[in-house]
């Protein structure tokens, strides 16, 4: 069965759609053309419903373009295409090859050994999972800032080694990347208790490799890491400038992908922005799906505080949660740390948790936050980021090169300060509060539509909150 028709559709869709959308929703589909019906198989119901709702017209339009009146009927199903041949290919290939004579690679069974660190005799490796059972999808608070990352992680947990391999999550400190890594690990092991799932910080990989070299046990090291079912590595940016570690990880990465074993990586920045890491590795990081996690919006911050308080059997008034969330914006870890401090103070003093009590308990933290983020600082940072003058932000100029940064700065001022809309308008050349409101709504809309605007907003939030 030729997949040339679906290959043509894929090529056009890849040109028409943003790279993230294509990787997230179109690449996982498998196609089968039979009896003038093109069946598209989605890995789960979530992907099927999304593709049918968002891309049905695009796909039907392409079928009509390529086939005219002979265009096949389109059918969606959950599952995998019926297999008539056995063939393993690297997951980054968009479609399966049509040849049937290629031999399937066989994974070599690891030789026996009794444990990793003591190495004398070959044996089945003893796997250190290191997955934290407390971090699950159930206690991960979802919002706009992390919705796509959570959905992708959930799909990986349901179908490890499938479409999103590798999965690369990136974002600032304390935004939930590590939580999602553990959640995936727990999800995989819940479905398959004997799965070999290994979570680790990238520095542990380096330490293990150094130990293996010192003990003349590099083959055992390779066997250990290349025989896992899922490898979850946190903070991959720490591989920077470690050439031997990168070399070893490069070969481990290739071996795992060829074996359809799942890889999930996290970093504090976009793969191509990681300095000191080889281009061939950065290229492979993007073979699957790359998803950003942004700082949580106000509603999500409130939900995080309420859920954390509930886990501690603490009644947290809604207005208090809102007060804290409005003033602490940078990351989840900071929010949880502030709440723990409030709870501890309340336990020590026996006082009720009120806004006045929180203001007192977090006095130094709130003062520091207000000192760090001001409208003047936002204007200066945005002007430097877009390479314009602060005077341009305050001017009446309406060219896009000035208007868009001005809207961005206004939206950031609303997000990161406690100033009212009229106060923000005054700070931007005496503009009306409705202008500020329009700017905020425009940036919110563009963040949904434009990857570049979304990245700009995240980068500026990270800079201003650090």
From Swiss-Prot:
Could you tell me the keywords of this UniProt record?
ATP-binding, Cytoplasm, DNA replication, DNA-binding, Lipid-binding, Nucleotide-binding
Alphabetical GO CC annotations of the entry are: cytoplasm; plasma membrane
Which region ranges are annotated with the description Domain I, interacts with DnaA modulators? 1-86
Renumbered to this chain, region (Domain II) spans 86-129
Location of the region described as Domain IV, binds dsDNA in the Swiss-Prot/TrEMBL record: 347-466
Cite the binding residues for ATP: 174, 176-178
In UniProt terms, what function does this protein have? Plays an essential role in the initiation and regulation of chromosomal replication. ATP-DnaA binds to the origin of replication (oriC) to initiate formation of the DNA replication initiation complex once per cell cycle. Binds the DnaA box (a 9 base pair repeat at the origin) and separates the double-stranded (ds)DNA. Forms a right-handed helical filament on oriC DNA; dsDNA binds to the exterior of the filament while single-stranded (ss)DNA is stabiized in the filament's interior.
Domain remarks in the Swiss-Prot or TrEMBL record: Domain I is involved in oligomerization and binding regulators, domain II is flexibile and of varying length in different bacteria, domain III forms the AAA+ region, while domain IV binds dsDNA.
- Name of the protein this chain belongs to: Chromosomal replication initiator protein DnaA
From which organism does this entry originate? Answer: Salmonella gallinarum (strain 287/91 / NCTC 13346)
């Amino acid at each position: 069965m030729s997949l040339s028709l679906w290959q043509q559709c894929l090529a056009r869709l890849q040109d028409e759609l943003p790279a993230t959308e294509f990787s997230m929703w179109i690449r996982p589909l498998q196609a089968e053309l039979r009896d003038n019906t093109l069946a598209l198989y989605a890995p789960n119901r979530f992907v099927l419903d999304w593709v049918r709702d968002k891309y049905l017209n695009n796909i039907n339009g392409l079928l009509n373009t390529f086939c005219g009146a002979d265009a096949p009927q389109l059918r969606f199903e959950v599952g995998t295409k019926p297999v008539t041949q056995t063939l393993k290919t690297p997951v980054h290939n968009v479609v399966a090859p049509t040849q049937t004579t290629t031999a399937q690679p066989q994974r070599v069974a690891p030789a026996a050994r009794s444990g990793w660190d003591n190495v004398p005799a070959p044996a089945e490796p003893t796997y250190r999972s290191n997955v934290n059972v407390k971090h699950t999808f159930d206690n991960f608070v979802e919002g706009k800032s992390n919705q796509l990352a959570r959905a992708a992680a959930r799909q990986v947990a349901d179908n490890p080694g499938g479409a999103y391999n590798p999965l690369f999550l990136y974002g600032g400190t304390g935004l939930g990347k590590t939580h999602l890594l553990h959640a995936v690990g727990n999800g995989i092991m819940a479905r398959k208790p004997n799965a070999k799932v290994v979570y680790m910080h990238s520095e542990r990989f380096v330490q293990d490799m150094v130990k293996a070299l010192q003990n003349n046990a590099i083959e055992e090291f390779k066997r250990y890491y290349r025989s896992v079912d899922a490898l979850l590595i946190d903070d991959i940016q720490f591989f920077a400038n470690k050439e031997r570690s990168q070399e070893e990880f490069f070969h481990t990465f290739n071996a795992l992908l060829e074996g359809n074993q799942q890889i999930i990586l996290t970093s504090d920045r976009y793969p191509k922005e990681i300095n000191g890491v080889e281009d061939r590795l950065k290229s492979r990081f993007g073979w699957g799906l790359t998803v950003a996690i942004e700082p949580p919006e106000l509603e999500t911050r409130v939900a995080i505080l309420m859920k954390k308080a509930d886990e501690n059997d603490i009644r947290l008034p809604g207005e208090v949660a809102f007060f804290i969330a409005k003033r602490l914006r940078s990351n989840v870890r900071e929010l949880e740390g502030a709440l723990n401090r409030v709870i501890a103070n309340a336990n020590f003093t026996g006082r009720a948790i009120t806004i006045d009590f929180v203001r007192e308990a977090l006095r130094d933290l709130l003062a520091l936050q207000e000192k760090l983020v001001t409208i003047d600082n936002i204007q200066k940072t945005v002007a430097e980021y877009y390479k314009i003058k602060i005077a341009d932000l305050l001017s009446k100029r309406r060219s896009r090169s000035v208007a868009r940064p001005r809207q961005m700065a206004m939206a950031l001022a609303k997000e990161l300060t406690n100033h009212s809309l009229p106060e923000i308008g005054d700070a931007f050349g005496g503009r009306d509060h409705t202008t500020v409101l329009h700017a905020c709504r425009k940036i919110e809309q563009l963040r949904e539509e434009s990857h570049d605007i979304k990245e700009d907003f995240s980068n500026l939030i990270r800079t201003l909150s650090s």
